[in-house]
């Protein structure tokens, strides 16, 4: 039998990560591999079964903070140059107590009331986008709806002026590109993003507005505030993790519904099922297909596998969400599925702070789309669908549809 070897940048994984991860889940659920990145090689582990993923997400022997296991020279090789190292200094890259402090400060600007107050605005944005789509019989869901909706929402939430949003979109697209060949373009986008955010932070310190940046700048607890670098990191995290995962949910979720006509019809007839439908789309599509940036802080043995200090840990979210030992008929989309304990938003102290916003956008977007265009159909062969090049985030390049029969 051919020895399994995980290639995160390989064509097979890019085309269908669920199939690749599923094979590891069945044959080698705890898989050691060598990660080649930016000219260096790192020992790593791929975890693919639900119970094992949960165990590693809970394990205190696993750190999110690379500084706990690597020196500055190693970090520089793995990551990016010092002027943009804020990308690895956000709260998802911290353990307690640093994580607790950061999350507490950020939560002040991201309360449930803040999110719920966005409902009317999100509904209005969705309807305006659908109005534009209605002018034609065909559309690209990604270009016309799935990408602009969360982008406009996050831009308004942050207080990004309308005249700056096209450039902001360019930076965002570049920052989520994980292909090694585009490293310098990504780094340049990060530098420009940082310079732009620095100006906004400066303005909000002097003259606060009713936006997220102002709230983050002025958030305080026990005399502690977010530093300049922490502000860059948090806003980077918000844009990359918050924006792209929602774009992926809306795009891949629409594709999943169009490919499962019975479930799509069920949702059209019973829009009150939207909450369970969105949870199932989160499970089935896994907008974050894999979580990385975790390291063992000490040597330990797990189920007979010898894990060494400094080993990288990859959590196969997309595989855990389709584990037949945990989900009944996991390869089938079932919008009635309940309970649905997917881990698309992570687990524990690093559970996604933006989950309520992503869910709200999903509820509004799918209901509005299916109500406006009940006859929407896929306008391209499934094999011709193009996926974005990102090892960790699963998203579509485009999704051509016909809007009426």
Curated annotation (Swiss-Prot):
Molecular-function GO term, any one: iron ion binding
Name of the molecule in the record: Polyketide biosynthesis cytochrome P450 PksS
Sorted UniProt keywords: Antibiotic biosynthesis, Cell membrane, Heme, Iron, Membrane, Metal-binding, Monooxygenase, Oxidoreductase, Transmembrane, Transmembrane helix
GO biological process: antibiotic biosynthetic process
Entry GO terms, CC: plasma membrane
Domain of life from the UniProt record: Bacteria
Role description: Involved in the metabolism of the antibiotic polyketide bacillaene which is involved in secondary metabolism. The substrate is dihydrobacillaene.
Sequence similarity: Belongs to the cytochrome P450 family.
Organism: Bacillus subtilis (strain 168)
Pathway membership: Antibiotic biosynthesis; bacillaene biosynthesis
Keyword NADP: no
Localisation: Cell membrane
């Amino acid at each position: 039998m051919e020895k399994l070897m995980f290639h995160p940048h390989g064509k097979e994984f890019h085309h269908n990560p669920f199939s690749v991860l599923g094979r590891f889940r069945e044959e080698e659920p705890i898989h050691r591999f060598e990660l080649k990145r930016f000219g260096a090689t790192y020992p790593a582990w791929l975890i693919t079964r639900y119970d094992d993923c949960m165990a590693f997400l809970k394990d205190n022997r696993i750190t999110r903070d690379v500084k706990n296991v690597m020196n500055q020279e190693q970090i520089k090789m793995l990551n990016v140059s010092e002027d943009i190292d804020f990308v690895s200094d956000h709260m998802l890259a911290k353990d307690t107590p640093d994580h607790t402090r950061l999350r507490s400060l950020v939560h002040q600007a991201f309360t449930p009331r803040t999110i719920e107050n966005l409902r009317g605005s999100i509904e209005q944005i969705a309807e305006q986008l659908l109005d534009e789509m209605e002018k034609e019989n065909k559309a690209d869901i990604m270009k016309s709806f799935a990408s602009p909706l969360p982008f406009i929402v996050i831009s308004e939430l942050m207080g990004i002026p309308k005249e700056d949003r096209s450039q902001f979109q360019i930076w965002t697209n570049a920052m989520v590109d994980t292909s090694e060949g585009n490293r310098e373009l990504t780094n340049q986008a990060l530098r420009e993003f940082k310079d732009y955010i620095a100006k906004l932070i400066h303005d909000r310190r002097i003259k606060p507005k009713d936006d997220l940046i102002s709230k983050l700048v002025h958030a305080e607890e026990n005399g502690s505030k977010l530093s300049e670098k922490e502000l860059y990191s948090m806003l980077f995290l918000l844009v990359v993790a918050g924006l792209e995962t929602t774009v992926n949910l809306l795009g891949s979720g629409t594709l999943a519904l169009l490919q499962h006509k019975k479930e799509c019809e069920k949702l059209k007839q019973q829009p009150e099922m939207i909450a369970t439908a969105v949870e199932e789309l989160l499970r089935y599509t896994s907008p974050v297909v894999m979580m990385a940036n975790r390291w063992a802080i000490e040597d330990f043995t797990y189920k007979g596998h010898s894990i060494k200090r400094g080993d990288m840990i990859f959590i196969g979210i997309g595989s855990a969400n389709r584990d037949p030992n945990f989900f009944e008929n996991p390869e089938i989309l079932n919008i009635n599925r309940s309970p649905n304990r997917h881990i698309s938003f992570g687990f524990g102290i690093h559970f996604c702070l933006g989950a309520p916003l992503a869910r709200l956008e999903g509820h509004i977007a799918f209901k509005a789309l299916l109500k406006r265009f009940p006859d929407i159909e896929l306008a391209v062969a499934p094999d011709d669908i193009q996926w974005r090049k990102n090892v960790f985030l699963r998203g579509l390049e485009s999704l051509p549809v016909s809007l009426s029969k």
